[in-house]
């Protein structure tokens, strides 16, 4: 910075000065003085904006710019070459694109002062520059940086970690909340680049807000109010999400507040092609600051445009919410989209559907095809709505020559159907039914803490002892594979059971019969999928003896009781050990009387069982040690803390 400011002192009058630096001085608020000194006292003749990956190694991640200026004040246009888009897979194109005149821009540096802070936006057209005559968005809405707790591990939880009866949902005023009963409040914390609705993942312990680094106590008037939130890491796009209220907000999930009608106009603008133009210019780093958004010019729509925008926004938010709630990480998740509701099932049983539908009802493939079409329709409708909104805002800002309304598939942030993912999530839902988290008889969460209500379960009764073994053979009647087969039969009917199991197995992939494929999935892949869905904060805990699969069992964290390990040891670990002893005895007899070729196969089985028996023997000692401690857990402490209490007997979180 010192050298940039002093550069004219090192040059003769009318002499030329050149630099190669990063581009931060051109845009960031902290460099305003640098820009003012340079733009007022020097005449820029050329700029080459290389973007990232000009150099090899770590320095290649930095956006590089080269420029030449003259120690004079001349009223002439500078020439700039913009190569920022030629990166990643297009890096090799930088050289040739330097000579492509479509990448050339010509600008008067005096025009940069049209924008507060004078960012060097050499590629802005006159129309974009003129738009800065409009007031900033900060005059239209209250845009607020979020709070910092100072210790997220202590004060934040994923909502799935807690007792759901202790979360204060849908509150509009903090005074409505008894923090001794419901200390946890939903919390915006950014997340993936998702538009319109979603990323409802965290809750904050508001009963401890007095310990936060910065609780934004001067902003109490916007606590829990409807807003728009976004992720501060935006890259080359911007994604606003509508919130109906009931949330606190993090510095990573800052918010804009206004009346509801204004919020709808604002989120339409945020998620249009207009906002990224300004965000990129006002702060080209990957982090979007509150101050940058406040400076974006706000051009008000006319009455007709206003009504059209609100209609489109309402529909698009609703569609996005429907998609978000179709996955189990949403607290408004009702049931898996491939599972018929209890009402549909009753109608089916009383023959209220057409004959053709009744024939298809028991086939998972039919439900998947319906879901696939629903996803496709939703995706296409959101894209159509976004293109209509783009048309409106492009017209409002007069940027028809700059932008097209077209939206690419990659920019639509709802998910399409995916057979493998959706079958794996169906299995996860089934496991939830086995534990009582979900029920086929009620929509939504049946149990996630609080009081157990047995009346919610009639079609499938949850596992009574909260321990479901995962075996590589039929050792237990309530083994997870057997339970899953029974679940599929109950949901879709016995007539289509084998067909449905094959459909599931084909989606999972693998060798063997459908039941073998499903069993192998539970043994090898289910828990990895679970950790991914729940972001390494599992609600089903895998008790695991090790690599030989001597013993595996799932436990639902919200139903954990202090005597669980003692029951697991006597009812499952000891039972498994006895089965190994019995099998090994039978194998020894069989080997003695087997032919040479059979003996090879049987000996291999014997070795596997011996290794499993040895592994479970060592595991039993660890379980015994912990069982004697009669450990209790508090869900408020979070998965990270509670899981560690049983680290010696649980699968590693990877």
Language model segments and positions:
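Flexible, glycine/threonine-enriched loop-and-boundary segments that flank and lead into catalytic domains
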Residues: 1-4, 50-52, 156, 160-189, ...
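Signature of N6-adenine DNA methyltransferases within the class I
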Residues: 1-174, 199, 209, 214-218, ...
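Proline-centric
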Residues: 7-12, 253-264, 275-323, 332-365, ...
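A generic secondary-structure signal for well-formed alpha-helical elements
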Residues: 11, 15, 24-25, 38-46, ...
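Secondary-structure capping and boundary motifs in well-ordered enzyme cores
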Residues: 23-26, 30, 58, 222, ...
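Short coil/turn segments at secondary-structure boundaries
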Residues: 138-154, 170-172, 199-203, 279-286, ...
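Short Ser/Thr-interspersed hydrophobic loop/turn segments at strand-loop and sheet-helix junctions
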Residues: 221-239, 249, 266-280, 527, ...
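Terminal accessory regions of large proteins
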Residues: 330, 337, 350-353, 361-366, ...
